[in-house]
Amino acid sequence: MLNDPFQRLGLDREILTVSQLNGRARALLEDVFAQVWVEGEISNLARPASGHLYFTLKDRQAQVRCALFRQNALRVREILRDGLAVRVRGRVSLYEGRGDFQLILDLLEPAGDGALRLAFEALKEKLAAEGLFAAERKRPLPAHPRSIGIVSSPTGAVIRDIVSVFRRRAPQVELTLVPTAVQGREAVAQIVHALELADRQGFDALILARGGGSLEDLWCFNEEVVARAVAACATPVVSAVGHETDVTIADFVADLRAPTPSAAAELLAPDSSDLQRRLDGLQRRLQLRMRHLLAARRLQLDGLSRRLRHPGERLQQQAQRLDDLELRLRRAMQRRLQGDAERLARLDTRLAAQHPERLLGLLRQRLEHLAERLPRAMRSTLRERRQRLEATAQTLQAVSPLATLGRGYAILLDERGRAIRAAVQAHPGQRLHARLAEGALELRVEAAFPSPPQPD
């Protein structure tokens, strides 16, 4: 007789294999927990080549293995990562090969703000594919804006910070608030309307601004209609939503993203002190340039004046020279007469001493003859010199440009002082200087008519 406690108790013993045990446990679990929702945090995410996803879902006290097969993983595989809070649906099962308790999932969605982040990434990918984020769409901000439109809440620190920066750096810029809600159910429609209204006002640039907050607080700036309203603006838009770490879809669509509203004001407000320094430098350069230009024009004018000296001045010089020659000739004749007289006196003295009567008579005759010839010679010489001077004066008068001017003609000069000799040297609208016989004119060319070609 066998010593069997089960037999003594009258019980039949059923011995299961490990596979049988795991199979029965699996069937029991799948029957009782055919569909459950579980929330937790992903860890130990594995992505094998098969396309299935395996990870551990955990909370603070426990964890469970999860399997998400390929057909159900396609929609979410790109956003899953360790640490992501998710909400999953599936059935409880047992992996018989290892006896591992696990969840077989058919649905997974981000939990908390995870759903918002999923929507954020989907819209970001969609708008990027349309080219709304492309660099070639970005417009430069105005260097010296005169008016800025601010699309923001009329209350709070944001508008005060922006106004403070502009008052400090560029008080001359006109600021206009286009009020809108920036949080809540009405915010999206109000922001779109405010952007459309501001874009029609002719501002040099727009600032779309809001203070910091959670992802839910800033979500209106991640709505597609707001993003498209920003993209449709003809006015350059600076997005200044939240703090430096906050990123919205509006930031990607705007022409420029500023980390904070104050930074947006800094970017658009030119420093007035720096502008004044630049203006002073430009003024000094302009004054120096004008002095150099005036000096060059004076030199050019002096040169032209010397080249266009009046022929009368040359005649005056020739007349002065003739008078000088006449004076010198008179003095020379006087000196010669005086010398002859002195020599005659000496000869007379010598003759008187020697009494050469015959020689004295001859000398007296010769002297008388010379005295008769001398005035004629002087008159002849003066007449010849005067005739030469008159001929020279007539020649100068004939070739003088002022003689031509005196007949009603004019000399045309361009802005560089060059003479205009043909119509092709001038063009309509050009300013010319006309020199007349008396005075000058400033002219403007209405039309130029070149001479027709001469026949062969």
Swiss-Prot record:
Compartment(s) where it occurs, according to its Swiss-Prot or TrEMBL record:
Cytoplasm
> What CDD domains would the database entry show?
ExoVII_LU_OBF (cd04489)
Question: Known catalysed reaction(s)?
Answer: Exonucleolytic cleavage in either 5'- to 3'- or 3'- to 5'-direction to yield nucleoside 5'-phosphates
Q: Which GO annotations describe the biological process of this protein?
A: DNA catabolic process
Gene Ontology MF: a single term:
nucleic acid binding
Give, as one word, the top-level EC class: hydrolase
Write the record's keywords in alphabetical order, separated by commas: Cytoplasm, Exonuclease, Hydrolase, Nuclease
Q: Which Pfam families match?
A: Exonuc_VII_L (PF02601), tRNA_anti_2 (PF13742)
Q: Which residues cross the membrane?
A: none
Q: What is its EC number?
A: 3.1.11.6
Q: Which family does it belong to?
A: Belongs to the XseA family.
Q: How does it assemble?
A: Heterooligomer composed of large and small subunits.
Tell me what this protein is called: Exodeoxyribonuclease 7 large subunit
**Gene name as annotated:** xseA
